[in-house]
A protein has these predicted regions:
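Long, low-complexity intrinsically disordered regions enriched in Ser/Thr, Asp/Glu, Pro/Gly
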Residues: 5, 18-20
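N-terminal signal peptide c-region/cleavage motif recognized by signal peptidases
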Residues: 13-14
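Primary mode marks residue(s) on the alpha4-beta5-alpha5 output face of response regulator receiver
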Residues: 21-195
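Sec-dependent signal peptide recognition
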Residues: 2-8
Length: 195
């Protein structure tokens, strides 16, 4: 847990400064509204006692369980998540461009009950792409809707479809070190316009 808090503090410090060195603008949301947004990502049995972070890593509330709920990945706060410690470490590696040992991936779990930003199911780098225009190099851009996610070793994941429209669970980012199981709790919808 101590290692986790050090990571959170370093993440928080690094995210309070813009690329040009200026301070990031203040949030238009009250602290209680931000906590409510973050808690909406998971069931109350997890989020009530979780550590709550804003999108930039600011600690809004220290928790008493091993979960972290955040307001999302950007200032719009449209994709809050609740992550266990294994998923939090996975996410930090993903965002930092580090390697992940998918063959020996320990079990991890996360909730995104408000959904996520649309991504290409096949391409991890699509997280920051323009997801509303389908081009020749885009695959399954989709809105995953409310879902749970599980980290599992490749030997388990290779038995599961990667088609987000097949119905039921599917593997996101298949055949990459970042593949993980998506468990939708609502319909998965395409997220692009045909041009």
């Amino acid at each position: 847990m101590q290692k986790y808090l050090v990571l959170v503090v370093l993440f928080t410090i690094s995210n309070h400064i813009c690329a040009d060195g200026s301070a990031k603008p203040a949030s238009p949301y009250s602290k209680s509204a931000l906590i409510k947004i973050a808690m909406s990502a998971g069931p109350p049995s997890i989020s009530l006692d979780a550590t709550i972070l804003d999108y930039d890593g600011t600690i809004l509330r220290k928790g008493t369980n091993q979960w972290v709920c955040n307001t999302g990945g950007d200032p719009q706060r449209i994709n809050p998540a609740c992550l266990d410690e294994v998923w939090l470490a996975w996410n930090e590696r993903f965002m930092a461009g580090k390697k992940n040992d998918i063959e020996n991936q320990p079990f991890g779990q996360a909730y995104m009950l408000q959904g996520d930003v649309p991504v290409d199911n096949d391409v991890p780098a699509s997280y920051g792409m323009d997801d509303h225009v389908k081009g020749p190099n885009t695959g399954h851009f989709h809105d995953s809707g409310p879902h749970m996610m599980f980290l599992l070793p490749r030997a388990v994941l290779e038995q599961i479809t990667s088609d987000p429209y097949a119905g039921g669970s599917y593997v996101m980012f298949p055949n990459t070190e970042w593949e993980h199981l998506m468990v939708p709790v609502d319909d998965v919808k395409p997220s692009f316009e045909n041009h």
